[in-house]
Amino acid sequence: MALLEICCYSMECALTAQQNGADRVELCAAPKEGGLTPSLGVLKSVRQRVTIPVHPIIRPRGGDFCYSDGEFAAILEDVRTVRELGFPGLVTGVLDVDGNVDMPRMEKIMAAAGPLAVTFHRAFDMCANPLNTLNNLAEFGVARVLTSGQKSDALQGLSKIMELIAHGDAPIIMAGAGVRAENLHHFLDAGVLEVHSSAGAWQASPMRYRNQGLSMSSDAHADEYSRYVVDGAAVAEMKGIIERHQAK
């Protein structure tokens, strides 16, 4: 049966995902940046309360995946922290200036991760040659690749995802970006073994007092009074679709 991973930005969302049938959580901060490394406090609280597998993302900033020496040092430190806290896996990725896997740095990440299952995130979708990249990641023992098939959403990239699946058994190809209940059957019919979804929506802040003329974001038009949360009903619906597909 296909595995359902839910992207979560808080402990509350991780618990919601777990309670509604998620098989695994990708734990992130900063949804507007596409997911950054969670704080130590969030990591510890999730580790204590969530019982399904949780894979934190290790990404020090938004933007591209070619990092300075200081940023890469932080990545390695965060990998070690996640390992010490007892998480079963993590999500990360590094590229060089030419859009290839940064091989020396990826080797260091894998050494720091040790027995943890490593997912190479959507840095894969920014690489220059996906098949060569997949071969490189297989050599390192990367467990899975999260990809939209190098398109803006995974449904548009489904043909590339199928090509990657046909390329070999490892790493596992996990489809993500725009995967929802209404299009999930396309991925299941294509033989995708793991799917990744945020399964959520922006929720209004409970604050009654609002200073509407002020923003804490560099984007002056950002909505400071909303937050992204997992929708338990959406998770349950996706899980039900997967179970019914398996029963066919």
Curated annotation (Swiss-Prot):
Signal peptide: none
A GO CC annotation given for this chain: cytoplasm
Keywords: Cytoplasm
Record-level Gene Ontology MF annotations: copper ion binding
Compartments it resides in: Cytoplasm
This protein's record includes keyword Cytoplasm: yes
InterPro entries from the UniProt entry: CutC-like, CutC-like_dom_sf
Record keyword Cytoplasm present: yes
Disulphide bridges, residue numbers: none
Oligomeric and partner information: Homodimer.
UniProt record similarity statement: Belongs to the CutC family.
Full protein name: PF03932 family protein CutC
Organism: Escherichia coli O17:K52:H18 (strain UMN026 / ExPEC)
Gene name of the record: cutC
